[in-house]
Amino acid sequence: MGHYDVVPVEEASLKQWEYPAFSGFISEKFIHGRGSLDDKVAVIAILESVEKLLNKGFEPERSIIMAFGHDEELGGNKGAKAIATILRERNIQAEFILDEGLVITDGIVPGLKAPAALIGIAEKGYATATLTAKVDGGHSSMPKKENAIVVLSEALVKLKNNPMPSQISEPVQFFINDIGPELSFVNKMAFANQWLFEKLIIQKYQATNTGNALVTSTSAATLLQSGMKENVIPMIAKATINFRLLPGDDDKTVRDYLKNTIADDRIEISMSKDFSPATSISPTNNKAYQDISKTIKEVFHNTIVAPSLMIAATDQKHYTGISENRYRFLPVQLNATALKGIHGINEKVGIDNYQLIIQFYEQLIQNACFKTP
């Protein structure tokens, strides 16, 4: 799986790019431009790998379906969702599904020297809430002590200071189990004795944005709306809050959290209809996962493989019921700097890296189909 739509580039950032953002410029070592990591790289690499296999005369012993969406960044309702609907209508059951997702991290996992290939065995849920503060307005020359903007701001501060409870979910537990033995002595000891060090482990995760997202159902204020004129105190102020939910949390969990944390009757809470729960957790003790893990080790030498939780949303959420084995992994090696290019500035993929991505898909198809040309 993959998608060939991309997120836009803010006009104010265009001059900060090394090369034009949509040029696809190929320099000596990199392919530059929006989509070079998310996610045109997977689409083109899959097609190139299939073309190479066909040129070798490869004949798979089973069907291989390539599903490419055109609106993943908008939710996938007209792309992946439509494809998945057709597959269900045809009663197609896949042994496994592989979509974009986690990557091969280089120097990102604290205490781990070797590169780590992380396979997403589940992805977080998605929910959006709108907070509406309603307070009498008036003229700015005679302000009251409180108005809608102030009341809403106080609510947002409460959410910031009182996040949802952190926990080690099952996918993160699997990650700890596999990565723990590869860490330094202190970290290894902590991971091996979670009954004693669980709070410390969670605190360590909470120290970074990415780590915190692995152990917490996060919330982020993304939209604000209020006021129409500088000398008029508005009667209404609205904020949109986006949540990414750990397995086990749902829209009721979010509503209860908002109600109890804000505890202000002047704030109305409404939940968007586009809620999607965290996906089911795919197994790691089956041939499908082992095929992916084996292929990673064959192509990316000296790389540790571990399951984990996908903190962002992918098109996989639409494929419920088509396979119990749904995985999220993009075979690209990235350090912390390169990761910032995804949805950011100077998105690019190394040419050598891209060749390995093609090799990965080519090898995976052969491993999964039991037959080599």
Spans of features found by a protein language model:
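Short, solvent-exposed loop/turn segments at the edges of secondary structure
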Residues: 19, 61, 92-93, 113-114, ...
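An extended, acidic, His-containing surface patch that forms the Zn2+-binding/catalytic region
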Residues: 105-106, 168-228, 235, 247, ...
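Flexible glycine/proline-enriched surface loops and loop-helix/loop-strand junctions
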Residues: 112-115, 132-139
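Short amphipathic alpha-helices in soluble, non-transmembrane regions
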Residues: 146, 254-262
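A common structural junction motif
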Residues: 4-5, 159-163, 259-267
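Acidic/His- and Gly-rich active-site-bordering loop/insert found
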Residues: 1-34, 55-60, 241
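Acidic/histidine-rich catalytic neighborhood of metal-dependent amide-processing enzymes
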Residues: 33, 37-118
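A short core secondary-structure module
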Residues: 77, 81-86, 141-165
